[in-house]
Amino acid sequence: MKRRKRKYKLRMSRADLGSMPEALNQPRALNPQMLGGVQGALPWANGMLYWPTLDDASEMDDYDRAAVMRAARYLYKNSGVIRGAVRDIWLLQGCIMPIPTTQDREWNRKARAAFLARVASPAAFDVTGKLSWKTMQAWAERKTSIDGDCLCVLARGLDGGGMVAWYSAPKIVTPPGLGKEDGWNQGIKTNAQGRPVAYGLETAPGRCMIIPAASAILYQRDPDPAVPRGESDLIHAIRHGVDIAEIHGFTKASVKLSAAVGFVETKPDADKAPGMAVAIGAKKKSGCEEKPENPAQSFEIVTGGGARVVSLAPGRDLKAIYDQRPSPNVAAFIKDLLAEIAYGVGLAPEVLFDINALGSAAARLILAKLKRWIDERKDTREVYMNRIYRHVLALEMEAGRLPRCKDPAWENVAWVGQRDLTIDLGREGGLAMNLIREGLADADRWTLATEGM
């Protein structure tokens, strides 16, 4: 006898339903998802985008940095485009000079004179005896554009005065036997907050000296709190620069080859190689035997000139080779690559590579943007120059060559650059004089902006 299965039904009253949690009373719904709504997150929309880490401190290791420096130095030595861009980046900025701004005006005058007397002499200011204040800034800016950074060690001379010793980026290394577990990364030791506490300076292959951070300056562009070292201005332009150099090299080789050949002798189709019938061994018809050719050519000197007349066999012709490379498409492509290089530096391509393409209105706008770019670069440089300025004046006061300042804030200083770039000094000068006359502008500031230091 089969037992019947009982069916149980769950019956709940309205009161029971009211006592249940509110979430159970609601119908179930899927969590909202974009499902590819953000186009930049679609992995199949483009080719492979290789970026293996999101840790800022690990974006570049020692190998990557060395590879970028080698490529950038190669381009600087062998590419006129890159060499000119690096030099123009410095020339557009120019050097900056200090003006003491303490409340002790007499001390300001003496401090400026003592500072300039010290830094104007390479023998007294630079350990190697090669760099003065202005040439030091030019060297540091060019090295930073190529290598990404450099190290300035604050030193003391035999007379007790302030000196500096500069070292290029490859000299900044991690001491042997130390690594990230010891706080070292790419030649810099940082504390738990990411603040540099020491630098590793290579003195000989396999030997390293540890320099306290208080005695050194890591001169770099766009300092990032999460990134230990600076990046080259050319880091985005490495492949573009190599491509331009290769295109120029191949084009030059083709032009030289075509110039070496010059002419090509041609012959009609009837005189070319035998056809398929002869190739497969067919017999020639009677009466169709080929006559032997006389390939000899005679050259005759034309009387009254140096030209030569070439005598060719019947049916032969000479054609000159004219090389049409680079084509307009290749020239336009190279121009696009140059624009990529300029944009990566932060400048308009017309400023670095094609200033003649600017009109008057566009030139004023680009010069205004250029001034902002120069100010941004100078803001970073002033931080480093402030430390050198304080180092020199502090040792001058300690040595007794400069009296003590009556103002406790003896470190106050203003920095003035070279004169501003302009294409219409007359119009801007007239406007400035009207503003000064009405008390809306400062005459000293305008003079420094137009004349510089």
Q: How would you name each of these model-derived features?
A:
Residues 77-229, 435:
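Structured, mid-chain assembly/scaffold modules that mediate subunit interfaces
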